[in-house]
Structures are given as C-alpha cells and as structure tokens.
C-alpha cells in the first residue's frame, strides 16, 4: 500500500474510533510497526493526531467534535444492536435504571417490550425522548448544561442531581478500554457523570463492542473492570480481555451480531 493511501486509512480509523494502536495497524495494513510510527509522526505534524504510548488519538477538539460523535453510531452497528438486545434481557419490570449516553446503550430502545414498567434516568436528551414513547416507562431527564456534541447533560448541576439518586442497574458505554481493563476517556465532563452513575447503582453493566479494546490507556482514567458486575460484548473481543474478566469473576455475555 502506498504511503498516501496508508495515511488516509489511518486517519479514517482515527476519525471512526478516536484512537489507534500501532500493533493493530501493523497487522491490518501489512507493514512494520516502524512504518506505522513514521506514518503517525506525519499525522502528528499535520495536527490531526496526538501520539500516545503504543498508538495515537485524535486531538481533543476533533475527538469531541461532530465528526467523531456523529459517526460513532455508525460503527459496528450489528454488534451494537446485539449487545443492546442482550442488555434489555437484564431488565426486570419495576426496575429503576440509569441509561448512559453511549450509542450502544441508546440502541436498547429498539428491543424494550412495549408495556414494560420501568423508571429510567438518563443524561441523554435523545434517549429521554425515545424512552418517553413507552406508556409505562417513567423517565427522569437529568438537567444541566447540554453538550453540543453528545446532546446530553453535563456539568455540576447534572452531577449533583445524579449523586442524589440511586439505581438498581446502570448501563454504561465506554469509549476506550485496555486489555487489562482500564477504562479511559478524553471527555472530562462525561467522566464525572459515568463515575457517579456507577457509584449510585447496585449493579453496573458495561456495554461495549470489541472495537473499544486497545493495548494502552489514553488520557484520563474513568473506571476499571472491577467497577462492573457484568460485561456484554461481541464475539470479536480480545481473548486476553475476556480472560481478564473471568479472572476477576465478572460475568461476561458474548453476543453474535
């Protein structure tokens, strides 16, 4: 593959996933890791990537921008739907649950029984509107400053309200997790809310397709596998990651798209 084509493909991976791993790119593109490092250096010089240990991420303003946020719902659509369907199976009538603003979590509305009785709390404006269509679901929309990119409530007002509530189950989506189970993010506003939702829940379920698994962490730690009682992911998930879940005695539900 010619260098220019390779650079375009690497940039495309970055735009879709928010991060790339040198080893994975080397295997995917059939070139040496040294070649990938040189390619990443070029992207860094152009201002379209930021180097991390073992890979690269999008610059913060691009990672949080409309290109990334709008495109994430188009990534691994079949996997996300299968994960969302499995997540709905964890709901029981009368549950009080927290629904995150992730694209995988948002897909749950496609599979929820029409007449199920629930109380759903969410920071996501779009999720609140979708859940409100169900006749027996009581929706609490967390208020606060609304992010222009995620269309969800963020900031101290949202955090204070969330910290005053309790849930049976929190369904949490994450942008990035290492094989060792360290969950990180660039989105500072979202980190505090996800942490609060986990802390205020009896049980937390991690919803993540296999593209979220990487070797090295980025920027800010959000949580770890130990904070979750269940992981729902797809069959392409890294075997070392799955082994780590088993070692930590975390229930894993592996779905097929």
Give short role names for the model-derived ranges:
Residues 107, 127:
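Internal active-site segments that recognize and position negatively charged phosphoryl groups
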Residues 94, 115-117, 201, 228:
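A general structural motif
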Residues 2-9, 13-28, 34, 38-98, ...:
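HTH-adjacent hinge/linker in prokaryotic transcriptional regulators
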Residues 2-12, 21-23, 32, 45, ...:
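Conserved phosphate- and dinucleotide-binding cores of soluble alpha/beta proteins
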Residues 100-102:
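Glycine-rich beta-strand-to-loop/alpha-helix junction loops that act as flexible
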């Amino acid at each position: 593959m010619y260098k220019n084509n390779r650079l375009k493909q690497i940039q495309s991976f970055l735009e879709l996933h928010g991060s790339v791993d040198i080893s994975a790119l080397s295997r995917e593109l059939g070139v040496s890791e040294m070649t990938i490092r040189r390619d990443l250096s070029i992207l860094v010089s152009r201002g379209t990537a930021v180097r991390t240990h073992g890979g690269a991420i999008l610059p913060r303003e691009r990672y949080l921008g409309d290109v990334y946020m709008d495109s994430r719902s188009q990534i691994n659509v079949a996997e996300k739907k299968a994960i969302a369907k499995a997540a709905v199976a964890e709901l029981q009538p009368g549950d009080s649950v927290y629904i995150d603003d992730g694209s995988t979590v948002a897909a749950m509305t496609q599979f929820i029984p029409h007449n199920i009785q629930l109380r759903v709390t969410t920071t996501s404006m779009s999720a609140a509107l979708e859940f409100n269509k169900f006749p027996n679901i009581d929706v609490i929309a967390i208020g606060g400053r609304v992010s222009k990119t995620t269309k969800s409530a963020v900031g101290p007002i949202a955090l204070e309200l969330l910290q005053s509530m309790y849930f049976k189950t929190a369904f949490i989506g994450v942008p990035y997790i290492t094989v060792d189970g360290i969950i990180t993010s660039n989105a500072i506003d979202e980190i505090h809310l996800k942490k609060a939702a986990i802390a205020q829940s009896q049980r937390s379920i991690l919803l993540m397709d296999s593209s979220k698994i990487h070797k090295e962490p980025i920027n800010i730690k959000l949580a770890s596998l130990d904070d979750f009682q269940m992981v729902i992911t797809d069959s392409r998930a890294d075997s070392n990651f799955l082994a780590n879940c088993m070692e930590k005695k975390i229930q894993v539900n592996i779905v097929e798209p």
